[in-house]
């Protein structure tokens, strides 16, 4: 199946555009059939109307998926791209322990409510409406950054509304591993960050050796253990993104990281 996009506004609904969807009428397996494998056969396409960037009540949408499907059918659309938010979270932490002393705000999303449940819902809806083509995906915010300070009443988040659309990924685990800020535990960059993590582990081991002794050495060992543990937690080799929201504008790099990840799937 191949498809191309033709963006247009449709019936006055924000964040919804029509697209031109071209669907091949014969199975993909027939491409390899025939006496001459190199011979190009004519391809028949069927043009259908569709909607892109649809969000449901699974994230911040106003309607559930069944309502959107019924409305789309009434208005002559046959293809729906479902793009709920994969993660909607923001954090601000106090230096030097920004990952420990922090405030987090999060809204419902695919990953906060469960990616498996999200795809099960789309699959069930597709079975109940076989005349419709439902293509799962997400709307994602790979990066944002802070300027100002909450203590000066000028804290500002930048690029929070700079989003990308992901379409066609159907494995829930792929969404759990998206390289975006605040997406939870990830081993994607663990090897890359392991060298610095080893330093903290060595310090903790040194602290344990000193803590086993008596007197001043024991106190020093405990101090080293506590500080090395806090630094390891703050460093977090299992973070979901190589970037953070405190180092200023990172240009296109966080977005390219996400694009490369999706292209590899």
Report residues per predicted region:
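Gram-negative bacterial Sec-dependent N-terminal signal peptides
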Residues: 1-5
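Extended, charged catalytic domains and RNA/DNA-binding interfaces, predominantly
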Residues: 6-265
